[in-house]
Curated annotation (Swiss-Prot):
Name used for this protein in its record: Potassium voltage-gated channel subfamily KQT member 1
Domain comment in the entry: Each channel subunit contains six transmembrane segments (S1-S6) with S1-S4 forming one voltage sensing domain (VSD) and S5-S6 contributing to form one quarter of an interlocking pore-forming domain (PD).
Post-translational modification: Phosphorylation at Ser-27 by PKA; increases delayed rectifier potassium channel activity of the KCNQ1-KCNE1 complex through a macromolecular complex that includes PKA, PP1, and the targeting protein AKAP9.
C-terminal assembly domain (tetramerization): region residues: 590-621
InterPro entries: Ion_trans_dom (IPR005821), K_chnl_volt-dep_KCNQ (IPR003937), K_chnl_volt-dep_KCNQ_C (IPR013821), K_chnl_volt-dep_KCQN1 (IPR005827), Volt_channel_dom_sf (IPR027359)
Gene: KCNQ1
Activity regulation summary: PIP2 molecule is essential to activate KCNQ channels by inducing the coupling of the voltage-sensing domain (VSD) and the pore-forming domain (PD). Upon channel activation, PIP2 disrupts the VSD-calmodulin/CALM interactions, causing the release of CALM from the VSD which triggers the opening of the gate. Calcium potentiates KCNQ1 channel current through calcium-bound CALM. Calcium-bound CALM competes with PIP2 to stabilize the channel open state.
């Protein structure tokens, strides 16, 4: 079957090649410049088989050659072999401007999101209407217990139950079918996994039980008495259908789990107060008789009932202590136990308030995520603008429109008006996801080459083949009207129509410079939006930021202290005990740095003295030894002539390095 259908497809594409080559004469030359298959697949000039020409086939210049009659001889450099059909889903490509196909999985996903993940006003209207219907059915069930409205409510309830059973049964089947869009619910076992969810089990029980009650418990159009009781219970279960996501129970469970320690403590102490107060009241009142001659606290169970009614502040008044001892015990334990039994309500209330505030803060934080993503994207685009890679500039190149005339041998002019009406629709997205709509990507246009510029302008051809959306870098031509006026023809000849750039190789330096400027502007705008989104939510956030900053500062100070200890040593290493006892304030960092500077200054002075001494020894060695005996003293002098009398070198001291290394002179040499 595939082999039989391939020849017509090849002939159709070859016919399209012939019309394409007749309208664009520069395709072969551009194809030689872009021989790579990747560039041809990206929508280059050589890969324009699936796109419409800029001018229609009929609008050719007088000097241009006529299209070839037979498409069997393609130009050199272009291989026209049979090409397999492209089976890619356009929803997968980010550069696709077509709307997603209504496939089976796509419909399943939309239905699943509508029923299981309601968002938007349509979902709200649907689920709120279901809630009102279930509530109305419950109201009629209540009215059926009143004798005045029993006849009317029972008949109406019968038909409402039939409608609800059919509706909920159909909805259950649709939910089961739409769950196949998720990977974990695919197939029979996946559907069973979906049916094992608690809310799905409740829906199935309600539907099946309602069908059984309608089939067995009805007599004509009226329910039996036993069936009415079953219907009431099922209507109560239907109220669980309203909250299918279980958000209420999850919220309650999270609050209880967070404050579980406080709740357990208060309930434990309150329970201890309850049993102790009930026991002591029972001991005091077990023999007391009331006015009617009856013992009210005849058992410990009666005392426990009185304790529960008292500590929960209900106070039925059916059992009252009679003796003063019992009243005193009851009053003391009531004040103590009631305070603990009232604490869980306050704990849960504060927990719900904190949970709501946490959700609001999370929403405020979630607003920063798109702003941060936009800032990162624009910063990366500014960095990538210096890269000559073709993928950097691909988003600014317009993909030519798919030609409708290439797919059929005989074009139908009736559809051109429909294409002209719908041409603005796909360009709204421009192949960019909805999250990137904040960053507008302009398309670039350029002047047409001289060899491809026709003598007579065909405005309709441009209008039908090129989709125009005015952007920052594009000048959209105004709508021209052909008339018989010679002056208007002269005005029309002076106009220049801009053709969209369809390949990266057509970009010039001024295009790239303009793109860099636009990207830099988008970066500054995204930075400003991110700074606005980073504003604190309330005063607590400001205090938290300050405390976090203070904590970071203290950590850095401790790290600096540790490095100073490693560099200049700890105070206990070079400070004597006497100084520690005199002044403990000298252990500060400033005092330690001053001591280090003093030590460095002393070392510098000693090095100067040693240097002067070496110079003196060198001069003595070159000038000869001193005459006379006695102790030999070396007085190293500085540049200003100051003598350091603290350094003496007696003759009977140990020999120096110079004395050991320099050879001694003989007596004849000395004379």
């Amino acid at each position: 079957m595939a082999a039989a259908s391939s020849p017509p497809r090849t002939e159709r594409k070859r016919g399209g090649w012939g019309r394409l080559l007749g309208s664009r004469r520069g395709s072969a030359s551009l194809a030689k410049k872009c021989p790579f298959s990747l560039e041809l697949a990206e929508g280059g000039p050589a890969g324009g088989t699936l796109y419409a020409p800029v001018a229609p086939p009929g609008a050719l210049s007088p000097g241009s050659p006529a299209p070839p009659a037979s498409p069997a001889a393609p130009p050199a450099g272009l291989e026209l072999g049979p090409r397999p059909p492209v089976s890619l889903d356009p929803r997968v490509s980010i550069y696709s401007a077509r709307r997603p196909l209504l496939a089976r999985t796509h419909i399943q996903g939309r239905v699943y999101n509508f029923l299981e993940r309601p968002t938007g006003w349509k979902c709200f209207v649907y689920h709120f209407a279901v809630f009102l219907i279930v509530l109305a059915c419950l109201i009629f069930s209540v009215l059926s217990t009143i004798e005045q409205y029993a006849a009317l409510a029972t008949g109406t309830l019968f038909w409402m139950e039939i409608v609800l059973v059919v509706f909920f049964g159909t909805e259950y089947v649709v939910r089961l079918w739409s769950a196949g869009c998720r990977s974990k619910y695919v197939g029979i076992w996946g559907r069973l996994r979906f049916a094992r969810k608690p809310i799905s089990i409740i829906d199935l029980i309600v539907v099946v039980a309602s069908m059984v009650v309608l089939c067995v418990g009805s007599k004509g159009q009226v329910f039996a008495t036993s069936a009415i009781r079953g219907i009431r219970f099922l209507q109560i279960l239907r109220m669980l259908h309203v909250d299918r996501q279980g958000g209420t129970w999850r919220l309650l469970g999270s609050v209880v789990f967070i404050h579980r320690q406080e709740l357990i403590t208060t309930l434990y102490i309150g329970f201890l107060g309850l049993i102790f107060s009930s026991y002591f009241v029972y001991l005091a009142e077990k023999d007391a008789v009331n006015e009617s001659g009856r013992v009210e606290f005849g058992s410990y169970a009666d005392a426990l009932w009185w304790g529960v009614v008292t500590v929960t502040t209900i106070g039925y008044g059916d059992k009252v202590p009679q003796t003063w001892v019992g009243k005193t015990i009851a009053s003391c334990f009531s004040v103590f136990a009631i305070s603990f039994f009232a604490l869980p309500a306050g704990i849960l209330g504060s927990g719900f308030a904190l949970k709501v505030q946490q959700k609001q803060r999370q929403k405020h934080f979630n607003r920063q995520i798109p702003a941060a993503a936009s800032l990162i994207q624009t910063a990366w685009r500014c960095y990538a603008a210096e890269n000559p890679d073709s993928s950097t500039w691909k988003i600014y190149v317009r993909k030519p429109a798919r030609s409708h005339t290439l797919l059929s041998p005989s074009p139908k002019p009736k559809k051109s008006a429909m294409v002209r009406k719908k041409k603005f629709k796909p360009d709204k997205d421009n192949g960019v996801s909805p999250g990137e709509k904040m960053l507008t990507v302009p398309h670039i246009t350029c002047d047409p080459p001289e060899e491809r510029r026709p003598d007579h302008f065909s405005v309709d051809g441009y209008d039908s083949s090129v989709r125009k959306s005015p952007t920052l870098l594009e000048v959209s031509p105004t709508h021209f009207m052909r008339t018989n006026s010679f002056a208007e023809d002269l005005d029309l000849e002076g106009e220049t129509l801009l053709t969209p750039i369809t390949h990266v190789s057509q970009l010039r330096e001024h295009h790239r410079a303009t793109i860099k400027v636009i990207r830099r502007m988008q970066y500054f705008v995204a930075k400003k939006k991110f700074q606005q989104a980073r504003k604190p939510y309330d005063v607590r956030d400001v205090i938290e930021q300050y405390s976090q900053g203070h904590l970071n500062l203290m950590v850095r100070i401790k790290e600096l202290q540790r490095r100073l200890d490693q560099s200049i040593g700890k105070p206990s290493l070079f400070i004597p005990i006497s100084e520690k006892s005199k002044d403990r304030g000298s252990n500060t960092i400033g005092a330690r740095l001053n001591r280090v500077e003093d030590k460095v200054t002393q070392l510098d002075q000693r090095l100067v003295v040693i240097t002067d001494m070496l110079h003196q020894l060198l001069s003595l060695h070159q000038g000869g030894p001193h005459s006379g005996g006695g102790p030999q003293m070396v007085q190293p002098c500085s540049e200003d002539g100051s003598i350091h009398p603290e350094l003496f070198l007696p003759s009977n001291s140990l020999p120096t390095y110079e004395q050991l290394t320099v050879p001694q002179r003989g007596p004849d040499e000395a004379s």
